[in-house]
Amino acid sequence: MIKKLGLNFKNTKKVTNELKQRIASVVIALIIFRIGSFIPIPGIDTTILSRILNDQKGTIIEMFNMFSGGALSRASIFALGIMPYISSSIIIQLLTLVIPSLSEIKKEGEVGRTKINQYTRYTTLVLALFQSIGIVTSLPKISGMNQIIIHPDFYFYFTAIIILVTGTMFLMWLGELITECGIGNGISIIIFIGIIAGLPSAIVHTIEQTRQGDLHILLFLCVLILIFSVVFLVVFIERSQRKIIIHYAQRQKGRRIYSTQSTHLPLKINMAGVIPAIFASSVVLFPVTIISWFGIDRKCYLLKTIFFYFQPNQPLYLILYVFSIIFFCFFYTGLVFNPRETADNLKKSGGFISGIRPGEQTAKYINKIMIRLTLFGSLYIAFICLIPEFMRSAMNVPFYFGGTSLLIVVVVIMDFIAQIQTLIMSSQYESVLKKANLN
């Protein structure tokens, strides 16, 4: 196969060495991340914090703690995790829609992308600062955490805030370093490692339950089959595309006449990714988190009712969760894909869709297809996110992953494999072009 592609041993060795270096860079960066997640902030009693967080099942705190690889429950220097960066990225994307100057910067290509990334970093710093101040100052006010700070003086608060902000900025830099020198999206890989950090212990616990008879062996096998089926569905949907055929009219360049060419515009079914699931979880779990985290008096009938009906296994929670996912899918897809802009670019490049007039009609046609795809994609995300809830409540199965986490894990693995394939294929094409004296 190597000979057919025109590759020699020297080039193959070069690709292998580059791949090894990139994978080594990712591994080293992730080892640093995991070590940092075990370094505690000085002055906090981590035993009290860990005990309180163990009671925060089915809240935003549990989800954020999972994303940080347990760093939040250990009050580590990476307790804030990478969430401020994700939030700032979405905020900047929103601002590019409402602020004309930012919209123009976005269209400037590589230079504009660099500026947008810089604004995202500044916003991350501001968000991390506000979040760290909020967390550190509110810790003693939380029910059961009166003694969590050993010496609650100015020096502690100042040091803790600086450490948390620095930890988040370091993770952001580490993620960008992985993206540049490693393989895949660095931020996604950091979240991925945070999620799977507790997977080995969860697997051992499930196997132990099966061995002791607490979990029937047939039910265990059914769960395994269901998990593999869900993973297959996620891979299938994430790789699926709706291709719109684009034609380019006959054109003349010098003495050469180029005939009509055709290509396609690929539209992913789930263009919004996992962001809608994260936002939907945060919004729906917010009331329970506030009541549980700050110990609001549950004797109040209204608060008691809210706390009960917003539990993850309640019908109201599930209905609101599904509708939130659908809403955020449409909302975020509108941010990342603009049919009118796509139609204008096609018109400028001489492309058109058969039977559709260029310009406004093309934009409406693409938008119509996107609405259908987004609806299907949102229902798919909702289905994936509800499966773990069903397994926990109806089947009484201890499932470590939530639907959001499962989506992130599978999508990141797919992206990682795709990046490796791209690296290998690009090297193969380069070798073929050199051998044919085309490069």
From Swiss-Prot:
It comes from Buchnera aphidicola subsp. Schizaphis graminum (strain Sg). Belongs to the SecY/SEC61-alpha family. It is found in: Cell membrane. The chain crosses the membrane at residues 23-43, 77-97, 125-145, 154-174, 187-207, 217-237, 274-294, 317-337, 369-389, 397-417. It is a multi-pass membrane protein. This is Protein translocase subunit SecY. InterPro entries: SecY, SecY/SEC61-alpha, SecY_CS, SecY_dom_sf. The keyword Transport applies. The central subunit of the protein translocation channel SecYEG. Consists of two halves formed by TMs 1-5 and 6-10. These two domains form a lateral gate at the front which open onto the bilayer between TMs 2 and 7, and are clamped together by SecE at the back. The channel is closed by both a pore ring composed of hydrophobic SecY resides and a short helix (helix 2A) on the extracellular side of the membrane which forms a plug. The plug probably moves laterally to allow the channel to open. The ring and the pore may move independently.
